[in-house]
């Protein structure tokens, strides 16, 4: 009798160690993946340094610019684009360039462009435009729903390269975005307008080999958005959490009671349905997002519950070890609840900081 009891205790201990290892491995893997992703993102965002010899552009025109983002009228991560309404103005000297007439939106299209004001006095020129544009933006949703993004608008001259036109940001403006900009579920911050060089990996078949027109001065401005609190997290996964909680109730049912397995299978279908709902909110990507991982953890938890129920049923019905089955259920219930809450808490802590 003592030997059988020791075997039963050994089975429970092995099961607890197994669940502990799964929890620790999953927690470490997810946190390492998040940290590696952020490190890689920082390297990717590092500005590319493009050197231009000033002697190669002795006759370029300096064009001073300013921007004011009025609103983001539409944002779709699923479709990888957004619409913006903004003001942009240019100041320059001379008649060699026409920045207001020739500018274009990189990776997007201008839907409307209206000249709001202009002043031309001798060589001094000023033009102000109101523009609405649609911009293509491949959103990186690796950390969804704890993701943040920069909604940037990039402006280039469609005719003149850096050798003829150079954008220079004005520093006289403190407010660069409308205080009425509101994107539900996100905090909004202003990004300082900058001018940078954009190199195209082609010479466009240019016959002028001495001055290759593949480097352009580029205006970059916009806003940064970050998730506002944990509201979206709980909204996305409340169905999943309820499904897991319902499955946990099965621990309090007798192993040979058929509805115990029905509860687990029903919870599994609910978790899978929630996963399809999450997939419908994300763009089609070739990697597993954080939301995918959270949902897969819930599905795995329910699957492990069904495995545990099968083992407990075998102990209870086939071996007649009702007391061992009861202890197995009791310890499993405590371990499942603690470990599932821990791994979700760990994900929130790592992803939100």
Regions found by a protein language model. Name each.
Residues 6, 13, 30, 331-334, ...:
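Alpha-helical hydrophobic membrane-insertion segments
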Residues 33-34, 278, 352-353:
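Membrane-helix interface motif
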Residues 345-353:
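Juxtamembrane boundary at the C-terminal end of a transmembrane helix
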Residues 10-27:
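Hydrophobic membrane-insertion alpha-helices, especially the h-region
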Residues 26-220, 224:
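Soluble non-transmembrane domains of integral membrane proteins
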Residues 1-8, 323-327:
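Short, Lys/Arg-rich N-terminal segment immediately upstream of the first membrane anchor
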Residues 11, 88, 204, 322, ...:
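Acidic, low-complexity intrinsically disordered regions
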């Amino acid at each position: 009798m003592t030997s059988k009891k020791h075997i039963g205790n050994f089975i429970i201990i092995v099961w607890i160690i197994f669940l502990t290892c799964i929890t620790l491995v999953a927690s470490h893997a997810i946190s390492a993946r998040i940290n590696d992703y952020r490190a890689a993102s920082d390297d990717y965002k590092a500005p590319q340094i493009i050197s231009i010899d000033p002697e190669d552009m002795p006759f370029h025109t300096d064009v001073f610019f300013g921007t004011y983002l009025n609103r983001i009228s539409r944002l779709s991560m699923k479709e990888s684009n957004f619409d913006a309404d903004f003001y942009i103005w240019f100041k320059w000297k001379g008649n060699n360039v026409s920045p207001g007439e020739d500018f274009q939106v990189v990776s997007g299209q201008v839907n409307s462009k209206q000249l709001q004001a202009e002043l031309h006095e001798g060589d001094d020129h000023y033009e102000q435009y109101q523009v609405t544009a649609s911009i293509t933006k491949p959103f990186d949703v690796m950390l969804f729903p704890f993701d943040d993004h920069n909604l940037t608008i990039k402006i280039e001259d469609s005719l003149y390269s850096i050798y003829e036109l150079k954008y220079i940001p004005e520093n006289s403006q403190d407010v660069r975005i409308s205080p009425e900009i509101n994107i539900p579920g996100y905090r909004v911050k202003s990004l300082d307008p900058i001018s940078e060089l954009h190199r195209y990996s082609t010479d466009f078949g240019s016959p002028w080999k001495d001055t290759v027109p593949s480097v352009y001065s580029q205006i970059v401005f916009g806003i940064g958005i970050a998730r506002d609190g944990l509201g979206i997290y709980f909204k996305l996964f409340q169905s999943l959490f309820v499904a897991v909680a319902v499955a946990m109730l099965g621990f309090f049912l007798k192993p040979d009671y058929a509805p115990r397995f029905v509860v687990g299978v029903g919870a599994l279908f609910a978790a899978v349905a929630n996963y399809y709902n999450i997939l419908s909110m994300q763009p089609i990507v070739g990697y597993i997002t954080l939301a995918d991982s959270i949902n897969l953890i819930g599905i795995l938890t329910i699957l492990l519950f069904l495995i545990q129920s099968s083992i407990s049923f075998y102990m209870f019905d086939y071996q007649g070890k009702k007391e061992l089955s009861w202890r197995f259920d009791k310890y499993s219930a405590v371990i499942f609840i603690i470990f599932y809450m821990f791994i979700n808490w760990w994900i929130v802590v790592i992803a939100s900081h």
